[in-house]
């Protein structure tokens, strides 16, 4: 019997749990939150859609009862405050570091073999914090960001091409931030045809720019962080792990020399399966892409330094 847990029953966490249930990714999905009644209410609401939508997954909600999460295969951490308009992901670090560290430690008491998927922002830094504070092997700590950024990239590509997003392949690597992500336009394709042969350089650059500010654009429109795509991206990562699909998905993972970088978690393509990260895929980058990746890594390192400043590491 497979089991997934989502910690944090806010917009992103509840969306992730809902997608996991609807797609029957696990036999049981547990939602845990600190706010009394919220996860229980949302779980009940979801279960009342089971007959309408035709899924058999059981969704359970609980308030701060980590015993309910016992023996989870995969745990998604969405806990923390959401990003407010004008706030950078990095400004969240002081608050969210303490929350994420506490959650991860409590989860492992009851699910010592669980694979952790981190969504909390700043995502690369929270993934790094989890890895360093827990001492788990690096294949078991995964940051979701690249899956979301790549989905946004494919959306903007499909809009420019006038096609379905499922007909487009595209990948975003680097940090999960407005200035640190690197949409790899050179490798994007539509039905196997390089997008660079179908769109002008100017249009392609517009797509890249829109992708990079995709999260901030939604925050301005919504007044808070987006939740449908982030929650779905988290569920997408969980599905590849629990179902051992061996999908290649860009995720924030710990590097030890890959792409010329070490001692940080940053977005690169990986193969996801039952062991979490089955393999880090090293792409052959151009000189320009290598330079952008090095700058992105430097920015992530700088944000990670704040963990020591706030006493989280």
Predicted regions and their residues:
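Rossmann-like NAD(P)-binding element
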Residues: 52-114
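N-terminal Rossmann-fold NAD(P) dinucleotide-binding loop
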Residues: 13-14
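C-terminal substrate-binding/catalytic lobe of Rossmann-fold NAD(P)-dependent dehydrogenases
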Residues: 134-140, 149-313
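Conserved N-terminal Rossmann-fold NAD(P) cofactor-binding segment
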Residues: 32-72, 301-310
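Glycine-rich Rossmann-fold phosphate-binding loop(s) that bind the pyrophosphate
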Residues: 9-10
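Rossmann-like NAD(P)(H) cofactor-binding subdomain of soluble oxidoreductases
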Residues: 88-154
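Short beta-strand element of Class I
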Residues: 26-30
């Amino acid at each position: 019997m497979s089991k997934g847990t989502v910690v944090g029953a806010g917009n992103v966490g509840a969306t992730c749990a809902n997608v996991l249930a609807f797609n029957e990714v696990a036999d049981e999905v547990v939602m845990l939150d600190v706010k009394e009644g919220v996860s229980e209410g949302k779980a009940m609401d979801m279960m009342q859609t089971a007959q309408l939508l035709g899924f058999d997954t059981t969704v359970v909600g609980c308030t701060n009862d980590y015993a309910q999460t016992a023996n989870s295969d995969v745990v998604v951490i969405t806990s923390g405050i959401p990003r407010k308009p004008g706030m950078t992901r990095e400004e969240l670090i002081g608050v969210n570091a303490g929350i994420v560290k506490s959650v991860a430690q409590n989860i492992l008491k009851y699910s010592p073999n669980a694979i952790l998927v981190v969504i909390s922002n700043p995502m690369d830094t929270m993934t790094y914090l989890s890895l360093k504070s827990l001492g788990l092997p690096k294949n078991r700590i995964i940051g979701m960001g690249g899956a979301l950024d790549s989905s946004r990239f494919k959306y903007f590509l499909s809009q420019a091409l006038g096609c379905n997003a499922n007909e487009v392949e595209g990948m975003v690597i680097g940090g999960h931030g407005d200035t640190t992500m690197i949409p790899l336009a050179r490798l994007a394709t539509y039905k196997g045809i390089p997008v660079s042969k179908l769109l002008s350089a100017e249009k392609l650059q517009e797509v890249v720019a829109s992708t990079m500010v995709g999260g901030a654009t939604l925050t301005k429109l919504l007044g808070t962080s987006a939740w449908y795509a982030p929650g779905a991206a988290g569920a997408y990562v969980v599905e590849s792990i629990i179902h051992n699909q061996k999908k290649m998905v860009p995720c924030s993972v710990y590097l030890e020399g890959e792409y010329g970088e070490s001692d940080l978690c940053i977005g690169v393509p990986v193969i996801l399966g039952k062991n979490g990260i089955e393999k880090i895929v090293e792409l052959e980058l151009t000189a320009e892409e290598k330079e952008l990746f090095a700058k992105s890594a430097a920015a992530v390192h700088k944000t990670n330094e704040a963990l020591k400043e706030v006493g989280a590491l």
